[in-house]
């Protein structure tokens, strides 16, 4: 009778064959912008805000086809040819990435799979619930797994170009809320994480053939030791499983992409978050208690190979203005100022990619640096836009002083708390 004597082990990631060599894209500051789009204000805001990092959504099924359509680029992988909509790539990604690459901005692509179109249908997980906007990729058949690998290989090759570079990859969206965002049905957390880690590893191993500096990020919400929604998982449990799987099956350099919104998304006064405490057992991690993340990545057992700290991007984070009344707009700016002082002081936090650039109805509350980009508001800059601009400059201290009274503190000294 056969008996399993060890866990399966993945190939040594340090031995991945490199097809080319590109330089790393280091962060020049901790200030970034989330959800870049092709917009007339792109270059203005990248320059005026001093952006060093950014994210861009990569919805694979929007531009990948299994059969050729007019204007598609053919791409052969594993003996099969797939097709990619060239005009979509140019207008949605290339023109944006050309501007970020010219400025040395480190961009992370967020891999999303809507279950639409022929590629989306093939990539759809067999237990997808039919409701969530995105699906976990189907890696239960050779055909669908190869399709996903082909998409990753195409993207990795195209966007390892120094002139339109994606430096890192965020794997899906808020996977602690898989039931609502990256769906594969209602699964036990270990089953979900086993599948999710395969998606992460596939991306990591393929991308590292083109860019050995690239990191892959787990995307999670502000829930830490509490499920942030019905049917969700606890983030800390997911990270513990990441460590266990990595130890058993072979470690790789995965990193953390946290959505550290206030505990109550509609309340910008994050300094009052009662559920965000200075404890590793906190229910939420928000801009108030980023010290928790800073401590977590500083612990040896959580580090890559036990001694290399994993990156932390606040890849979708910010505060809202519940309305366009002056008080709400000023509270939003104060919430950012408070969070920025924490971010800038904590070595374990690599940066924030503010979400969102413009107010967006799909967010539920107005989170933008700018108002709605419609005929009425025309994307007008909000007070938080100017506060964001001043952050990290010689004008920061003088400009941020106006927010102390609103937050209820006399100075920024002593803001960082010890985590027992």
Language-model features, listed with the residues they occupy:
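Boundary/entry segment of secreted carbohydrate-active catalytic domains
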Residues: 1-62
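Structural preference for beta-strand elements that scaffold enzyme active sites
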Residues: 28-32, 52-55, 104-108, 166-170, ...
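Short, acidic/polar
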Residues: 35-48, 148-158, 232-245, 330-342
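Noncatalytic carbohydrate-binding groove/subsite architecture in carbohydrate-active enzymes
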Residues: 40, 166-167, 191-326
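Substrate-binding cleft and catalytic face of glycoside hydrolase catalytic domains
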Residues: 52-226, 263-264, 359-364
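Aromatic-rich peripheral "rim/lid" segments of glycoside hydrolase catalytic domains that contact
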Residues: 72-73, 126-130, 161-165, 180, ...
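Alpha-helix N-cap and loop-to-helix initiation/capping positions
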Residues: 84-88, 139-147, 187-195, 230-234, ...
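A structural motif corresponding to the C-terminal end of an alpha-helix
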Residues: 92-107, 158-165, 202-214, 245-252, ...
């Amino acid at each position: 009778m056969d008996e399993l004597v060890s866990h399966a082990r993945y190939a040594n990631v340090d031995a991945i064959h490199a097809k080319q060599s590109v330089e790393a894209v280091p962060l020049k500051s901790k200030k970034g912008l989330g959800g870049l789009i092709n917009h007339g204000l792109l270059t203005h805001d990248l320059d005026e805000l001093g952006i060093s990092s950014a994210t861009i959504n990569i919805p694979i099924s929007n531009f990948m086809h299994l059969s050729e359509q007019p204007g598609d680029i053919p791409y052969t992988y594993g003996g099969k040819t797939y097709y990619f909509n060239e005009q979509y790539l140019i207008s949605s990604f290339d023109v944006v990435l050309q501007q970020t690459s010219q400025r040395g901005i480190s961009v992370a692509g967020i891999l999303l799979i809507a279950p639409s179109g022929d590629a989306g249908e093939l990539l759809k997980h067999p237990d997808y619930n039919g409701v969530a906007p995105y699906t976990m990729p189907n890696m239960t058949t050779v055909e669908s797994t190869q399709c996903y690998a082909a998409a990753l290989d195409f993207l990795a090759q195209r966007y390892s170009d120094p002139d339109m570079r994606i430096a890192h990859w965020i794997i899906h969206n808020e996977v602690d809320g898989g039931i609502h965002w990256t769906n594969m049905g209602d699964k036990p957390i270990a089953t979900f994480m086993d599948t999710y880690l395969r998606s992460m590893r596939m991306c990591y191993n393929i991308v590292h053939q083109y860019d050995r500096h690239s990191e892959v990020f787990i995307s999670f919400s502000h829930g830490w030791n509490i499920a942030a929604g019905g049917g969700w998982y606890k983030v800390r449990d997911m990270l513990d499983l990441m460590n266990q799987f990595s130890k058993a099956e072979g470690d790789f350099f995965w990193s953390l992409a946290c959505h550290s919104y206030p505990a109550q998304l509609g309340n910008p006064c994050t300094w009052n978050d009662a559920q965000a405490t200075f404890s590793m057992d906190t229910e939420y991690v928000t801009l108030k208690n980023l010290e928790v993340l800073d401590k977590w990545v500083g612990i040896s057992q959580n580090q890559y190979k036990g001694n290399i700290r994993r990156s932390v991007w606040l890849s979708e984070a910010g505060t809202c203005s519940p309305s366009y009344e002056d008080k709400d707009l000023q509270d939003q700016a104060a919430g950012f100022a408070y969070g920025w002082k924490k971010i800038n002081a904590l070595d374990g936090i690599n940066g924030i990619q503010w979400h969102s650039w413009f107010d967006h109805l799909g967010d539920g509350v107005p989170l933008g640096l700018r108002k709605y980009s419609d005929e009425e508001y025309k994307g007008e800059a909000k007070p938080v836009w100017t506060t964001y601009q001043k952050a990290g400059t010689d004008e920061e201290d003088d400009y941020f002083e106006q927010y102390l009274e609103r937050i209820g503190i006399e100075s920024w000294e002593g803001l960082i708390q010890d985590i027992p």
